[in-house]
Amino acid sequence: MLYAFKLGRKLRGEEPWCPEKGGKGGSSDKSAKYAAEAQKYAADLQNQQFNTIMNNLKPFTPLADKYVGSLENLSSLEGQGQALNQYYNSQQYKDLAGQARYQSLAAAEATGGLGSTATSNQLATIAPTLGQQWLSGQMNNYQNLANIGLGALQGQANAGQTYANNMSQISQQSAALAAANANRPSAMQSAIGGGASGAIAGAGLAKLIGSSTPWGAAIGGGLGLLGSLF
C-alpha cells in the first residue's frame, strides 16, 4: 500500500522517478558529501597547524646560522685572538681587572708581601684568567643560542614531515572516496537490478503455485523495480 501511494505521487509528478544518485533518497550521496567535507576540514586543519608551527618557530631559526658561525670563528686561534683583543679593550675587562688587582694588593699589604714575586705573579695572571673565563662564557652562550636555532629548525622539519604524512593519508582517503563514488550504481542501475531480482523471485513463486504464465515473474519484477525506486 505504501508503494502504491508513492507510485501515485510519482505519476502525478509530485516526486521524481529517480531520487539522487545512490537511491534510497540520496542517503549515499549525503554520506559521501559529509565524508568529503570532513576530509576538507581535516586538510584545512593540517594547513592551519603547519602554518602556526612554522610561524612560531620562524623568529628563532636565524639563531642557528648566526651563532654556529660565531662558534666556528671562536674555534680558531685567529678568531680567539680577535675576540680577546676586543674584550681586553672593553670597559667590562677594565673594571674586573681593576677589582682583581686591588684585592691582590690589599691582601699582599696585609701580609707584608708587597713587591714579592708571588704578588707579581698573581697580578700577571689576572689578564689571562679573566680572558679565558670570558671566552669560555662566550662559547657557552653561543652554543646555547645556536641550539635554540637548531631546535627551531628541527621543529620545522618535524612539522613538515608530519604535515606531509597526514596530507598523504587525507589524499589517499579522498582518492578512495572518489573511486567508491565512481563505482556506486546509479538509481536507474539499482532499479534495473531490483527488477531483475524481483523477476527471478516471481518466477520461482509462479513455479511453486504451479502456474506456467509469466505473471509471477512480471509481478516480482515490478515489485523489485518499485522497491529500488523508493
Curated annotation (Swiss-Prot):
<keyword id="KW-1171">Viral genome ejection through host cell envelope</keyword>
<protein>
    <recommendedName>
        <fullName>DNA transfer protein gp7</fullName>
    </recommendedName>
</protein>
<comment type="similarity">
    <text>Belongs to the podoviruses gp7 family.</text>
</comment>
<keyword id="KW-1162">Viral penetration into host cytoplasm</keyword>
<comment type="function">
    <text>Component of the phage injection machinery. Required for injection of the phage DNA into the host.</text>
</comment>
<keyword id="KW-1160">Virus entry into host cell</keyword>
<dbReference type="GO" id="GO:0046718">
    <property type="term" value="P:symbiont entry into host cell"/>
</dbReference>
